[in-house]
Structure formats: C-alpha cells, structure tokens
Amino acid sequence: MTTQLEQAWELAKQRFAAVGIDVEEALRQLDRLPVSMHCWQGDDVSGFENPEGSLTGGIQATGNYPGKARNASELRADLEQAMRLIPGPKRLNLHAIYLESDTPVSRDQIKPEHFKNWVEWAKANQLGLDFNPSCFSHPLSADGFTLSHADDSIRQFWIDHCKASRRVSAYFGEQLGTPSVMNIWIPDGMKDITVDRLAPRQRLLAALDEVISEKLDPAHHIDAVESKLFGIGAESYTVGSNEFYMGYATSRQTALCLDAGHFHPTEVISDKISAAMLYVPQLLLHVSRPVRWDSDHVVLLDDETQAIASEIVRHDLFDRVHIGLDFFDASINRIAAWIIGTRNMKKALLRALLEPTAELRKLEAAGDYTARLALLEEQKSLPWQAVWEMYCQRHDTPAGSEWLESVRAYEKETLSRRG
C-alpha cells in the first residue's frame, strides 16, 4: 500500500465520519452488490449460432474496431481480461445464441448441456450467470414478430424457445448456487400505423403464460420481462410496451426489467424504480446510455447512472433489485468498454453508499429543502475517490486509468492477431 494512498484513505475516513458515514461499512456493502456484465459487448451481439448473420430486432451495434471475439474461447478470455480490471463481485449475462455445440441446434431445442462450458468457467471464476432467450436474428423473427406472431406454429416455436431457456437458466442457478435472472425481451412491433393493437397483445399475454407455466425453484431461476418504446423498423407500435409488461409483472408477480434506453428520451428509469417496487417483487435493471434513441452507448458516471444507484441504496433494495448492464459499442476497444461501463456502475453505487441519507431524510421531512440541497451538493465534493482507490487496492485492481495499460498490452498481444 502506498503512503500517498494510505494518507488519502485516512483523511477520507475522517471526512466521511464527520457526516456520519462509516466507509468500511460502505465497502462491505459494495462487496454484496454484484453487477451483471453482458457477454454481447464482446462480439457485437453476434453469438455462436450464426456469427456471420446480420443483427435484427430493431437493435444495432455500430463501429468496426478490430479484435472482436470470434468464438467462445476468445470471448471468455476477453471477459477474464476485463474482469481482472474491475473490482468487486460480478456476474455474467448470457444470451441463448452463445450456446456451444458441434452441430446446429434449433433454438427451441437448446439444453443445459449446450452451456456446460459456461457453467464450468463461471465456477472457476466464482461468478453467477444470468440468461436471456434470443428472440431476434433468426428466420422466424424476420417479419418482426415472435411471441405475438399470428401464425400459431411460429408463435409456438418462440414459446418453446423461451421454455427451453428457462430450463437452462434454472440449470445455471442450481449449479452455481445463486439464482439466474432470465429476462424476456422481444422485438415484436410494426413500422407504420397499426390498426389492431389489441390482438398481438392478447397473443403475447397467452404466450407468456404458457412460457412460465412450468414451476421452477425460485432459488435457481427468476423470470423477468422487459418493455421497449420502439426499435428500428418498429417505430409506430411495440407489442411489449411499458404498460403491458408492468401489468404482466404485477399480475403474475414476475420481475420487471427496466432498461435505461427503452423509454422516451425525456424519461428516466431512476424515477420508475420506487413506483414499480410497490407492485412487483423484484426488478432487473439494464443500465445503459441512450443518445437520442436506444443507442446503447457505454455507461458513464453521469447523473442518471448516479440516480439509479442512489435509488437502490436509499430504499435498501439490495435484495430486490438485480443490476445488469446493456450496451454494445463496436467503435472502441470492446474490453475497455466493459471496464469503463462496469467500473462506472460500481463507482455510482459506492457514491450512493457514502451518502448521509438518514440526515437528508430528516431535513426533507422537516421541510428544510435549503439544507437538503446544500448537503446534496456538498456531498459531491467529499473525497469518495480515495475510498474507491482503497477498494480497488483491496481487490488487486488498478485504481485509476492504469488499467488502460493492461488493455493496450492485451490488444497488442492478442486482439491484433485476430482476423
């Protein structure tokens, strides 16, 4: 431990103690808050089913930075490189298209065995796994509909895919001793004015009920559903809207997924957390950064990321909120993207844990909004960076931008040699 770091740490402890904050307790709590990293940043959502196929479903990864992972071994190696440079507990979020098989597997036939390598890798790296059915980039999703499709056979295919995905998710939870959160997102919608908005939603409701009909151990598997405002090619109508899934999660008591980029640009999910928690048992968050639309830019340590973290901490939602990331930027080093976004999420959580929330609540209850605003702003100047640096030190990860040197070395030695 360097003398400079130790001195900064001791001063920070004193400064935070003066406002009633135990920084050691804040770090202990941070160690109980895993962030689920998304595998698809590493290969631009290509997956291993058909890596050369085009990405569909109204989503888009832009850029062509060299070094993209081309197979599971490369993706796992890249993830390990990123995770070494991110302090504290982590999980990995997988999509169904990241299965491994020597022969083609239809999506409605995926099985736990196709993800055995991921489970063994997660065990070796002390990670939990989360999961997602992949209802996009497939011939049977080409017309823009999956679980709400008017064709019974196509709709059944996607129902069976989601059913099979739930069994994979339960396998993750059983093997790893921590529940897998399986999130259902579908791209279903229409480009232009839609006359019958009801029938697709009726079909989706019935399809989802069939998907979750098999009872699974909640210690192994958690169902979540995710809404979206629009996608490319589905600008006018999205079957799985916010109102649809809020109603579904409430009535079926599933988890609700709130994605930072899936609402109108003037809406923020930080304001939705406390409202949704009144009605649903658990929330899954997809922390992202929408720029004018659901662009999935790398997460920053900005006001909204901080507000999301603060909502979790202020309302003691540690056991009810699952924190996941969802961005994919192909214009920069993909490993750096993981590191920047995940470290920023963890920094936001730490800053929230260092807030004198009890004192702020008292001021708010007393109607002293002047003092509330003053303390909130002064809090921003307290030396949280010194606490972060100590946290990184304890987890044997670089505290500042030194991590970039490791990424550059890995890029030179490994990424640059990929075709």
UniProtKB/Swiss-Prot annotation:
Gene3D superfamilies: Divalent-metal-dependent TIM barrel enzymes. Its EC number is 5.3.1.14. It is found in: Cytoplasm. Binds 1 Mn(2+) ion per subunit. Mn(2+) binds at H262, D294, D296. Pfam families: RhaA. The keyword Isomerase applies. GO terms for cellular component: cytoplasm. Pathway: Carbohydrate degradation; L-rhamnose degradation; glycerone phosphate from L-rhamnose: step 1/3. GO terms for biological process: L-lyxose metabolic process; rhamnose catabolic process. Signal peptide: none annotated. One of its GO terms (molecular function) is L-rhamnose isomerase activity. It comes from the Bacteria. It catalyses: L-rhamnopyranose = L-rhamnulose. Keywords: Cytoplasm, Isomerase, Manganese, Metal-binding, Rhamnose metabolism. Its cofactor is Mn(2+). The keyword Isomerase applies. InterPro entries: L-rhamnose_isomerase, Rhamnose_isomerase, Xyl_isomerase-like_sf. Catalyzes the interconversion of L-rhamnose and L-rhamnulose. Homotetramer. Belongs to the rhamnose isomerase family. This is L-rhamnose isomerase. The lineage of its organism: Bacteria, Pseudomonadati, Pseudomonadota, Gammaproteobacteria, Enterobacterales. The gene is rhaA.
